[in-house]
């Protein structure tokens, strides 16, 4: 493979000096000895009690190196270092380097057995220990660090054999990092990798006057910066004990008293400072943070209340030695709502690869250059996978490290961290980025730190559970969990709402990162002790319904709650529509009765639902709700809106071009937003977004566009985010702001809607019916503006089956199709109401256009589609099941998203097009295909036979082993339908094989 689209680092400061140093090819020992010769009496290391000079450090290291060399010591021999954090750390490493060995620093808090196993795998013979560790049961030859001796002239002037001669390829360190198994991997660090960081930390070398905090555990690779960056530059190390780090007040005092100017610490410690003492790092010249994704809220607090001169967000896995990317944080990052991990430093090369290894704007980050490790010791298979050797554009071979981190490149070359490959989880068919949940929780302003995780419940039927632990921003007044979840529900889709657990303080592991493993264990321990077991069928006969139902709730919600009150509500306790679907399936299996999703939504308390189950035993409840009178009444809710007295603004005039759009974070909305942003006549676009503030709203918009590979950094010049709610009379805005924006806007595109195929009309009504009225009210306020409303042909319901209608005209009345509507889902019912409501307004002269697309699928050129819509889920499920339900004469109108938006924008460009409805469907009937033909194409696309089954037989097979993709919708598919024939909600678009192959390829990549 040959790489292109590489991201090289900019020309660093001090490049000439670095080049000369590399050209000399001297190892770390000789480079340090240069500093000793230049300034032997300069302070090298200082702590609370004492200090040692460069000359004294040299003398001490020489004596220890001599002891090592008496036993047939060989170059790059691994030497264990088990000492307390402090001066001994520095001396021990220097001694091993002087002897030509490889340092293997161990955390002294580890058990003897763990240390022994690690060093045995490295074939170590020697360990260096201090006085406090000399009595440990470690079966190696121990060399004890004695107190250093006074410096003599002889130590510097005589021809010593130490430091031994090494070069930049010398393996100086072996740093252990956790692996996917219980055995940690030993990462080899070469001298050239350390030198790369020393001279580019991150943008220029340290100054002689700098004092660098040694705050990191020496078994952690960032400690190499603490020690070697100052020593190779003639600067000073200041020791900070762990107990100092745990008390921010004491830490700030030490920074001041020791004159510390540079410190590398973890994001978790900065987060702690933000909530306890934001000024803790204010005396620093440079503060590096890293190890975890940057917390924008915490950074904003520190920048506002007590920033260091430079705050650097640094990135670098151990395999790339300390830092390989870096970014100086500024207030602009806070405004954008995200902090970049920066650009490559020094001679680092960054490459972003898709799953096939090809260059991409978003994908896995590969790192090349001087900092890359020689590999894991004694791990040839892992090295082959993690450190590929590939051809550079110059024709030279180069080694890269595959980080496993998903990143995104901005147009200006900055790189954004998206998440871990292994932090991307799936819950009931949905792909979820845990970082997105953490970011949203932090943006509520209620929490200081958040850790989200997916936990596989050991209890039958519960599946994966989303859990988030959070520390309150104001510990004295912790927020109500229900309040936080309510905010989240306005920001995130239902399947991303976690079970929220408050915790006083985040536990940290030995590397000062959030201990996610410990949090998972904590949750599982609580759940196991409190959850009721799922009842077996025979036992339900002798238990009351409410008790059995409570057991199901506890299992499905994985809620650590031992008892449920009769008034407890399934959805208030955190139940989502996906979990509601699972609950209905469990009820049918356990109680052997038919209960519909509608019954659950109408009776969501444990007491009410238990009564419904008792009533349903021996039969089934009605699954069709006839609310025709309600729907008709709702179509008249906007009749009191005053009709506009003037013609609408021409939104494409030079002095106009200001768009107000809803639903821009949805699939169709994201593509339409992208098209509008590319139009020269469009100057600004204001998007109504469910979010707590503008920054969070902008982040949602960006994530939506990035999800479909549409985002460009220049969009920020045109894009505005207005946090709000469709269901609110003034769209969630202050009335004055509502009026201001109404006069600002030139036109309105309304795509916002609640879409859930399993929920009733009553839950769709606020956003879809009332929201549409509120959008029209906005358009009528101030100057008159056209409303372009994107509906769907689903607004007609299954009219052909019930009314015999063969075709529907664009301007035909919707009233004749009301008879079929009770047999469709709540979303379609809300579409009918909103559509009919707007038709009544159009008859009164309101400037409104209605667009009714057929079934919208992916982009016809790129194949990018929505993996979460019904059609995509059904395709994947049918492929997995190798079967599909027979639905004779089921024809659907397939239209690609790019075609739909082209039609909308073409019509909307005409001033004379308002006042009508438009069907966006294939030009002729020959271009729509039925279910059988669609599945034949699916079989061709995946090169596999897909068999037809009678509908109920297919449902039984689905119930026995439901594919993950269809689990959320299984109860809807299984409900009784009119004449047991029409399976409401199944929609199949027209396809050809080549286009379907594009869609399947995209869906597979999204799974």
From Swiss-Prot:
Region (Adenylation (A) domain): 35-428
Highest taxon in the source lineage: Eukaryota
Pathway field: Secondary metabolite biosynthesis
PANTHER family reported in the protein's UniProt record: BETA-ALANINE-ACTIVATING ENZYME (PTHR44845:SF6), CARRIER DOMAIN-CONTAINING PROTEIN (PTHR44845)
Gene name for this UniProt entry: lnaA
Boundaries of every Carrier domain copy: 540-617
SUPFAM superfamilies (UniProt xref): Acetyl-CoA synthetase-like, ACP-like, NAD(P)-binding Rossmann-fold domains
Organism annotation: Aspergillus flavus (strain ATCC 200026 / FGSC A1120 / IAM 13836 / NRRL 3357 / JCM 12722 / SRRC 167)
Deletion phenotype: Abolishes the production of piperazines and suppresses the formation of sclerotia when lnbA is also disrupted.
GO molecular function, one term: oxidoreductase activity
Keyword tags: Ligase, Multifunctional enzyme, Oxidoreductase, Phosphopantetheine, Phosphoprotein
Segments for region (Short-chain dehydrogenase/reductase (R) domain): 659-998
EC annotation from Swiss-Prot or TrEMBL: 1.2.1.101
Domain remarks in the Swiss-Prot or TrEMBL record: NRP synthetases are composed of discrete domains (adenylation (A), thiolation (T) or peptidyl carrier protein (PCP) and condensation (C) domains) which when grouped together are referred to as a single module. Each module is responsible for the recognition (via the A domain) and incorporation of a single amino acid into the growing peptide product. Thus, an NRP synthetase is generally composed of one or more modules and can terminate in a thioesterase domain (TE) that releases the newly synthesized peptide from the enzyme.
Catalytic activity: L-tyrosinal + AMP + diphosphate + NADP(+) = L-tyrosine + ATP + NADPH + H(+)
Family designation: Belongs to the NRP synthetase family.
This protein's name: Aldehyde reductase lnbA
UniProt keyword Ligase present: yes
């Amino acid at each position: 493979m040959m790489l292109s689209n590489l991201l090289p680092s900019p020309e660093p400061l001090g490049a000439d000096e670095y080049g000369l140093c590399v050209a000399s090819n001297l190892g770390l020992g000789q480079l340090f000895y240069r500093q000793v010769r230049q300034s032997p009496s300069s302070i090298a290391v200082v702590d609370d009690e004492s200090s040692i000079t460069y000359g004294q450090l040299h003398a001490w290291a020489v004596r220890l190196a001599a002891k090592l060399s008496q036993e047939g010591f060989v170059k790059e021999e691994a030497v264990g270092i088990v000492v307390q954090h402090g001066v001994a750390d520095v001396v021990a490493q220097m001694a091993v380097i002087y002897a030509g060995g490889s340092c293997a620093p161990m955390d002294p808090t580890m058990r003897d057995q763990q240390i022994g196993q690690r060093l045995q795998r490295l074939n170590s013979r020697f360990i260096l220990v201090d006085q406090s560790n000399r009595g440990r049961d470690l079966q190696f030859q121990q060399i004890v660090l004695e107190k250093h001796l006074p410096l003599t002239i002889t130590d510097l002037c005589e021809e010593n054999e130490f430091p031994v001669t090494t070069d930049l390829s010398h393996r100086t360190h072996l740093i252990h990092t956790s692996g996917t198994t219980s055995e940690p991997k030993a990462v080899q660090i070469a001298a050239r990798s350390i030198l790369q960081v020393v001279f580019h930390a991150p943008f220029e070398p340290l100054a002689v006057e700098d004092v660098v905090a040694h705050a990191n555990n020496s078994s952690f690779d960032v400690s190499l910066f603490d020690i070697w960056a100052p020593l190779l530059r003639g600067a000073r190390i200041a020791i900070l004990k762990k107990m100092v780090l745990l008390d921010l007040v004491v830490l700030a005092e030490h920074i001041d008293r020791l004159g510390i100017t540079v410190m590398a610490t973890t994001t978790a410690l900065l987060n702690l400072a933000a909530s306890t003492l934001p000024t803790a790092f204010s005396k620093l010249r440079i503060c590096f943070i890293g190890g975890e994704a940057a917390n924008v809220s915490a950074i904003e607090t520190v920048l506002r209340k007590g920033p260091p001169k430079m705050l650097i967000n640094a990135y670098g896995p151990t395999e790339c030695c300390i830092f390989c990317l870096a970014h100086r944080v500024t207030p602009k990052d806070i405004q954008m709502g995200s902090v970049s991990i920066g650009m490559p430093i020094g001679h680092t090369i960054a490459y972003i690869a898709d799953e096939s290894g090809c260059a991409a704007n978003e994908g896995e980050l590969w790192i090349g250059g001087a900092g890359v490790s020689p590999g894991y010791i004694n791990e040839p298979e892992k090295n082959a996978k993690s450190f590929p050797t590939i051809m550079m554009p110059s024709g030279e071979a180069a080694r890269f490290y595959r980080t496993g981190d998903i990143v995104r490149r901005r147009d200006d070359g900055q790189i954004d961290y998206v998440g871990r490959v292994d932090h991307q989880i799936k819950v009931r068919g949905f792909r979820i980025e845990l970082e997105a949940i953490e970011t949203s929780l932090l943006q509520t302003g209620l929490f200081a730190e958040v850790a989200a995780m997916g936990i596989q419940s050991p209890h039958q039927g519960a599946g994966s559970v989303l859990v988030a632990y959070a520390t309150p921003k104001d510990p004295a007044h912790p927020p109500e969990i229900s309040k936080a979840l309510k905010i989240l529900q306005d920001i995130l889709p239902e399947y991303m709402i976690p079970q929220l657990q408050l915790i006083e303080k985040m536990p940290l592991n030995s590397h000062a990162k959030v201990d996610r493993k410990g949090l998972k264990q904590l949750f599982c321990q609580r759940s196991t002790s409190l959850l009721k077991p799922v009842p077996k069928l025979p036992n339900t006969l002798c238990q009351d319904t409410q008790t059995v139902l409570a057991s199901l709730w506890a299992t499905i919600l994985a809620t650590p709650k031992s008892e449920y009150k009769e008034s407890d509500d399934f959805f208030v306790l955190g139940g989502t529509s996906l979990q509601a679907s699972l609950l209905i399936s469990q009820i049918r299996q356990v109680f052997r009765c038919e209960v519909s999703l509608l019954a659950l939504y109408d009776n969501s308390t444990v007491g009410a639902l238990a009564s419904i189950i008792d009533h349903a035993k021996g039969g089934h409840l009605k699954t069709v709700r006839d609310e025709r009178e309600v729907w008709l009444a709702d179509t008249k809710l906007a009749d009191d809106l005053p009709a506009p007295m003037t013609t609408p603004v021409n939104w494409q005039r030079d002095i106009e071009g200001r768009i107000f759009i809803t639903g821009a974070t949805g699939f169709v909305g994201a593509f339409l937003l992208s098209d509008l942003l590319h139009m020269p006549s469009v100057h600004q676009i204001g998007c109504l977004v469910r979010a707590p503030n503008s920054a969070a709203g902008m982040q949602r918009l960006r994530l939506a566009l990035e999800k479909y590979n549409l985002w460009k950094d220049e969009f920020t010049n045109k894009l505005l985010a207005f946090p709000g709610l469709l269901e609110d009379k003034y769209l969630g805005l202050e009335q004055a702001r509502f009026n201001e924006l109404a006069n600002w806007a030139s036109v309105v595109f309304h795509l916002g809607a609640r879409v859930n195929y399993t929920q009733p009309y009553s839950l769709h009504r606020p956003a879809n019916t009332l929201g549409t009225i509120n959008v029209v009210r906005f358009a009528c306020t101030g100057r008159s503006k056209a409303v372009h409303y994107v509906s769907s042909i689903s607004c007609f319901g299954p009219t052909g089956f019930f009314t015999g209608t063969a075709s529907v005209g664009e301007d035909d009345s919707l009233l004749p199709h009301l008879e079929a509507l009770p047999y469709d889902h709540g979303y379609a019912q809300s579409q009918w109401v909103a559509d009919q409501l707007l038709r009544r307004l159009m008859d009164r002269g309101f400037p409104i256009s209605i667009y009714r697309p057929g079934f919208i699928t992916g982009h016809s050129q790129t194949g990018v589609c929505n993996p979460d819509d019904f059609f995509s889920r059904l395709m994947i499920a049918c492929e997995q099941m190798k079967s599909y339900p027979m639905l004779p004469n089921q024809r659907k109108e397939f239209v690609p998203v790019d075609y739909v938006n082209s039609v909308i924008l073409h019509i909307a460009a005409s001033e004379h097009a308002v006042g009508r409805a438009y069907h966006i469907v294939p030009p002729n009937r020959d271009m729509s295909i039925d279910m059988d033909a669609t599945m034949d194409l699916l079989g061709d696309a995946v090169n596999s036979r897909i068999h037809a089954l009678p509908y109920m037989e297919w449902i039984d097979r689905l119930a026995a082993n439901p594919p993950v993709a269809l689990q959320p919708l299984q109860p809807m598919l299984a409900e009784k339908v009119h004449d047991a024939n029409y399976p409401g909600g199944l929609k199949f678009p027209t396809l050809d094989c080549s286009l379907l192959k594009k869609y399947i390829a995209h869906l597979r990549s999204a799974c």
